[in-house]
Amino acid sequence: MKKNILKTMIFGVIGCLFTSCFSDLDTMPLDDNQLVGEKVYQTADGYTGVLAKCYSSLILTGQKGGDGGDGDLEGANEGYSSYVRLMFYLQELPTDNFIMPSSSNGLRKCLNLQWDESNASVIRWTYQRLYMSIAYCNEMLRECTESKLKSRGLWDQLGGECASYRAEARFIRAYCYSMLCDLFGNVPYIDENTGVKDIPEQWTRKQIFDFAESELKAIDADLKAPGTNVYGRIDKVAAWFLLSRMYLNAETWIGENRYNDALTYAKMVINDGHYPLASDYRTIFLADNDKCKEIIRPLVQDGLKAQSSAGTNFYVKAFVNGPMNELYNTGVGSRGWGNVRSKTTLVNAFDADDVTFDTNDTWGNQKKDKRAQFMTALPNQKKETWDDKDNMTSTFTCGYGYIKWRNVNQDNTIPAQGDAYSSIDFPLFRTAEAYLIAAEAILRGAQGTKEEALGYVNEIRERAYMSGKYAKDGIRSDVSGDITADQLNLDFILDERQRELASELVRRTDLIRFGKFTSGRNWDWKNGVRDGSDVEDHFKLFPIPATEFSNMPNLKQNDGYTK
């Protein structure tokens, strides 16, 4: 029911308002003297629609749905241009998780860690997508003020929600800046006070980090209490989670040890209790995952009202091919694209006995670790991502499929929205990661005991193995998954994050934090060779897109790249 409320808000209001009105904001100048799109703000629904656009900008691609030809990003392939799909290309493809052999739009450059400032369109589109989301949030903050609401006669209707609307827009903006900090380092800063003719100042990575941190702390009082907002919108816990993730990476990003803070905020997420671990890992990635209380920050999808070749539609269809639907219910029929397979390093992170797909046990109920969701049963399928001549190949059977994303409900039925597009909400933040953040922070020196860290890790592993309190009838639970204190170290945490969070847009960040992205660990096709080889350290950051320098000639490029 909650899910339907937000979807009605997003897709109904956006459909009515933004197709006709919000596009004006993309083409007309925004300044303090001329209220473009003024008709948007004449009703309370208009304001709700602008906030909805802030949210949906991270999962949808345009105004019409599907690949309707009215995408948000001018010149971008609409199917590619969803934030979630773009982030897969930047955060998963260059790592030890997945292979996608396509050469279009710079994907091969991302896979091989051989990009530059102009040879990978997906890098430019990611940069633009994040700034577009920031622009939507800035627009909301300009217009959702007490004085403007009163001047439009809307204060009585919206005054009680004004503070929370603003806080949510500031959260989304802070999240976008945190990702720009992660991906690009020193980037231009714009806010609601930046004029249309102003040339944005390029801030240092620390300035961007400090801004996002200060915003997340400042909005705490105005965000909804944990668990009280409608499904799909954020509350205080989302801000705590994002702070914990930022603090975990602070030493890498800005040279500051903030592990105590990472632990503090991760424990706030865990101990609050409104977002408990799901009892079954596999349910987090299904079409009815709006029932899953573990998801703190879902990016809402709907097979009818949020159609796109991006979003989780990509995560289902790109990861399967047509014949796989004959072996298990993919939820998309024979519509699989056959693009993405697992690298050998991801497969090897799991016990070999758990990797094999059993056609008589398609959910993997008899596996020890239920996270080992691979397709190994196609004819002539092999683990290696290369052919018999050691060449990269687009043949889908060279490499195992990864099948944790399924467009079906928990009872294995197709969702009511059908099987043409995915109805899986993307779990951008979920509580299991907070457990792993807490454990890692302790191992890096935060004020906690190793026994405490071990408890966090074993809680995750017991859930994965469905042992102890997670045991269910008919599902294997005789192996606990628990490890000992002697087994727990940072290398184990990195591997456990791979097992738990593969495909969830954090792997590049993890490898960099552990010092194993450019060197220290190799994988299939890193630097363009079969077994991988080291690359230069400047690949820890993506380049500022070359197209940005024509409008901002004083912009400084990241080291190792040219303008």
Q: What residues fall within each predicted segment?
A:
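Bacterial Sec-dependent N-terminal signal peptides
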Residues: 1-31
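Long, intrinsically disordered, low-complexity segments
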Residues: 20-22, 79-80, 86, 90, ...
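An aromatic- and glycine-enriched ligand-binding surface/loop that stacks and positions planar moieties
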Residues: 22-103, 107, 209, 217-218, ...
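Conserved, well-structured interaction surfaces
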Residues: 43-44, 48-52, 56-62, 94-183, ...
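C-terminal substrate/ligand-recognition segments
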Residues: 124, 370-462
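Structural register within alpha-helical repeat arrays
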Residues: 166, 173, 243, 250, ...
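Short coil/turn linking the two alpha-helices of tandem helical-hairpin repeats
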Residues: 181-182, 188, 249-256, 444-447
